[in-house]
Swiss-Prot record:
Annotated tissue distribution: Red blood cells.
Binding, heme b: 87
Disulfide partners: none
Protein's name in the database: Hemoglobin subunit alpha-A
Gene: HBAA
Amino acid sequence: VLSSHDKSNVKGLFGKVGGHLEEYCAETLARMFAAYPQTKTYFPHFDLQPGSAQVKAHGKKVAGALAEAANHIDDIASALSKLSDLHQHKLRVDPVNFKLLAHCFLVVMAIHHPSLLTPEVHASLDKFLCAVGTVLTAKYR
């Protein structure tokens, strides 16, 4: 459960990096595909090279979902309901992949904004990303 302090930390971080979120999410995907090659199976038709148009386009979608979740941090489940349905019924992404993506996102944030990613903010962002992953896999059952 995200505390009010966690919510404030997440919103503050997203406010500071918002203009780069799409770029960071594309970098996150490229990092995930390189570090965890099994995640590539969901994108057989993509050019998965870092910086490819398809990775950038999907990074934009991930950024949009994260921004939507952050903007509706008090009700992430409603904000991402349609995306949750898509992942359950059509995409059938292995739930562990959301954890891998979250880890890679934390790494990218630490690379680009080490001074912003204090231990408190890191913990809050990790909890937020776990909440997003939980929402996206909640309908799998």
